[in-house]
A protein has these predicted regions:
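Helix-breaking motifs and short loop linkers at transmembrane-helix boundaries and internal kinks
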Residues: 38-40, 72, 93-99, 160-161, ...
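Intrinsic disorder in cytosolic terminal tails and internal cytosolic loops
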Residues: 1-6, 450-472
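Structural signature of transmembrane alpha-helices in multi-pass secondary transporters
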Residues: 21, 50-53, 57, 84, ...
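Small-residue-rich packing faces within the transmembrane alpha-helices of Major Facilitator Superfamily
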Residues: 58, 85-86, 109, 170-177, ...
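Helix-loop-helix hairpins in multi-pass membrane proteins, especially solute transporters
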Residues: 61-197
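12-transmembrane solute porter fold
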Residues: 7-23, 28-30, 43-50, 65, ...
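A residue-level signal for alpha-helical anchor/packing sites in multi-pass solute transporters
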Residues: 121, 125, 155, 211, ...
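Hydrophobic transmembrane-helix bundles of small-molecule transporters
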Residues: 158-268, 434, 438-439
Length: 472
């Protein structure tokens, strides 16, 4: 029996890097009032620190695949971790909003290179039969970090000082760099001339789109400006797609879209990610503003969603191998929609135990679906297309993350309008309608799953092993 599995260790390393990146996008949200007081600015102004990070990540992700092939995957991965860690130190040392924002932009640059390159290292040469287990490992940060971030940030800001939110990245970064030197090969790929036009169109287009939806979610008095930024971003993205299809050496291509299983992760996968991404935003607000729970009580209940994420993990591979992708995606998609209905039915008489059970069940279906979508995305993608598929997937996941929060904010505003209430003072009825709306969004994603055949994605499954396990 092998005591050390290098493939497993590499997957855990990349999962840790992904956890750091996503955690830093969410961990400061509950600490914003404390940081704002130190900078002597209104707390609302600190939202630029959140937006700057997310926009910077989106801006530089298209560059990640090219940089990894040009300079070596290990070189870029280690450099990205170093930049991310150094920027974390600068964030902690910041004494003004301007310094803090610049540090967050630099941190976003590191995060943009760190996560996609890390995933590429794991996925490019991975045998298909190991894809299911590996993706399950590197998916858990996307499940846990958005839930743990606000709770951890609030705890650190309350019991220590907000600077430690960033300083805790220092030992993690050092460990990740040392592990990378031992575990990773500095593989390079064939690259042509750098596609600067493609980078500007894709990077700026995606970044403006993300900035627009961030503004849309956080401001109610600048609707036209936000929509204008989104429109410019979408225009640049359309021009980028046209450019990529015609360019001889594009920064990345859309060839992976030829595979039905990858298209599922792009279309239906994006829809369900947006719906699932709304839960960490809507649930705490509903518990506090709708039901009168304290921030600590709401955060504690939200951890049951995280518990559900973890509880199903040991069974996800067996479920996929036993029932196949199509059946599980369709059934689980319906369960996700029903989960939002259950959240919508919560009222003042609902016990904390029942709320915890509903959140736990939602965590189970959330974990199952994201693992399915992230696995089937690469099931039929050959190694020579993995870089482009990985880059496109990373961009979409970043955009889905922002869209989930924006759509949640818009759902609250629309529900308040329907009920004749103020969007600035939502009550339980507002959240009931919002949850029902997000359930409908989740249900729409099932359409793409129904278009799959029973055999789609079978190349990465081990059905014979699952059948043997059932018979024993």
């Amino acid at each position: 029996m092998k005591l050390f599995n290098k493939e497993l260790a590499t997957a855990l390393l990349v999962a840790g890097a992904l956890f750091m990146e996503i955690l830093d996008a969410t961990v400061i949200t509950t600490a914003l009032p404390v940081i704002a007081a130190d900078f002597n600015v209104p707390a609302a102004h600190l939202s630029i620190g959140v937006s700057a990070y997310l926009v910077a990540v989106t801006l530089f992700i298209p560059l990640s695949g090219y940089a990894a092939d040009k300079f070596g995957a290990r070189t870029i991965f280690i450099a990205a971790i170093a930049v991310f860690t150094f920027a974390s130190v600068l964030c902690g040392l910041s004494t003004s909003l301007f310094e803090f924002t610049l540090s967050r932009i630099l941190q976003g640059l590191g995060g943009a290179m760190m996560v996609p390159v890390g995933r590429l290292v794991v996925l490019r040469d991975l045998p298909k039969e190991k894809l299911v287990k590996t993706v399950a490992i590197i998916t858990w940060p996307a499940l846990s970090a958005p839930l743990l971030g606000p709770v951890l940030g609030g705890y650190i800001a309350t019991h220590f000082s907000w600077q430690w939110i960033f300083y805790m990245n220092i030992p993690l970064g050092i460990i990740a760099i040392l592990a990378s030197l031992y575990l990773l090969r500095n593989t390079k790929g064939d690259v042509g001339k750098f596609d600067i036009k493609g980078f500007l169109l894709t990077g700026v287009g995606f970044a403006l789109f993300m900035a627009g939806i961030e503004f849309l979610a956080s401001t109610s008095d600048k609707l036209l400006q936000s929509l204008g930024v989104i429109a410019v971003g979408l225009t640049l993205m359309i021009l980028a797609i046209r450019h990529v299809k015609k360019a001889k050496n594009p920064l990345f291509s859309f060839d992976a879209m030829q595979h039905k299983t990858f298209r599922l992760s792009v279309y239906g996968g994006s829809v369900v990610r947006v719906a699932l991404g709304s839960a960490p935003f809507l649930v705490p607000l509903m518990l506090q503003l709708g039901l009168g729970y304290s921030p600590v009580e709401a955060g504690s209940l939200l951890l049951w969603l995280f518990a559900g994420n973890l509880a199903i993990k040991p069974a996800t591979t067996w479920i996929m191998n036993t029932f196949g992708f199509k059946r599980v995606l369709v059934v689980n998609g319906v369960l996700i929609a029903l989960g939002f209905v259950a959240l919508a039915m919560i009222n003042h008489t609902t016990s904390s135990f029942t709320i915890a059970a509903i959140l736990f069940a939602n965590g189970v279906t959330r974990s199952m679906h994201l693992t399915l979508i992230n696995t089937i995305a690469f099931a039929d993608v050959p190694p020579n297309k993995m870089r482009d598929a990985n880059t496109l997937g990373a961009i979409l996941m970043q955009m889905n993350r922002g869209l989930g929060i924006t759509l949640s904010a818009l759902a609250i505003a629309a529900a308040a309008l329907i009920l004749g209430q103020s969007p600035d003072a939502p009550n339980l009825q507002t959240f009931t309608l919002s949850m029902m709306f997000m359930g409908a969004v989740a249900l729409v994603s099932i359409y793409d799953s129904l278009m799959l055949s029973k055999e789609d994605g079978d190349s990465v499954l081990n059905k014979r092993k699952a059948k043997k396990a059932r018979q024993s």
